[in-house]
Amino acid sequence: MNAIMLTQEEMAARIATELVPEIKQYVPKVTSVYFYGAGCINEEVCANVAEAIRASVPAPVIEVATDLLAAARALCGRSAGIACILGTGSNSCYYDGEKICDNVSPLGYILGDEGSGAVLGKILLGDVLKNQLPKALCEKFLKQYDLDRMTIIRRVYKEPQGNRFMASVTPFLIQNIEEPSIHSLVLNSFKSFFVRNICQYKGHEKFSVNFIGSIAYYYRDVLAEAAAAVGCTVGTIIKSPMEGLIRFHSMPA
């Protein structure tokens, strides 16, 4: 549920129809709700989300924050550190144990999002169409995904959510990571993520860099290699924030 893409009424309707039926018996007992989501970028948006939740779950405490803060809390708890998201998109921050103190804007998959699924997929598709990979590998890719040049162009430029389409082909990379050309593609994108994002945080060399998301999780070995190449150290890598968030919200403040 992206808070920027939906009105308060649309969010309230979705919560009422998709969430509440699953937790109906618990709603009267709920005293606190912590919601982390994409698009929760300012107080106005967060207030709209809180009201949408309150319409179905009238808890005394409703806290709304970004998915990046969720990553920081899940990865670092109440300790300072660098927290990153590497999934379809990418993001990062310096977190002081309470709040996000610095954030290099990810800029999305056109201008940024280095190391993300969308960008890895974009590079892969471009390399296939421009014959930058071995011929046998290009043919294998096109056959595996039943794609051709015009289909790729249509999916990227004309159909909605081109970024998700590009991210959807990244399993090919991990399946063929032993191929030197594929390994270099992934390694260079991860290096770019560290150089263009992490190395901008003051004192970054004092902290390990922690990650959440499917790309970080499945490509952890190449990610660690990229980090070492630019003088960084990878710390915790998890696929999902839920366990870490439960642990965080169970801690005494």
Protein language model features and the residues they cover:
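ATP-binding/phosphotransfer module of carbohydrate and carboxylate kinases, centering on a glycine-rich
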Residues: 1-33, 51-55, 75-82, 123-253
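Short, small-residue-enriched loops and turns at beta-alpha junctions
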Residues: 4, 39-43, 111, 158-161
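Short, charge-patterned binding micro-sites
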Residues: 36
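Phosphate-binding/catalytic loop of phosphoryl-transfer enzymes
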Residues: 40-139
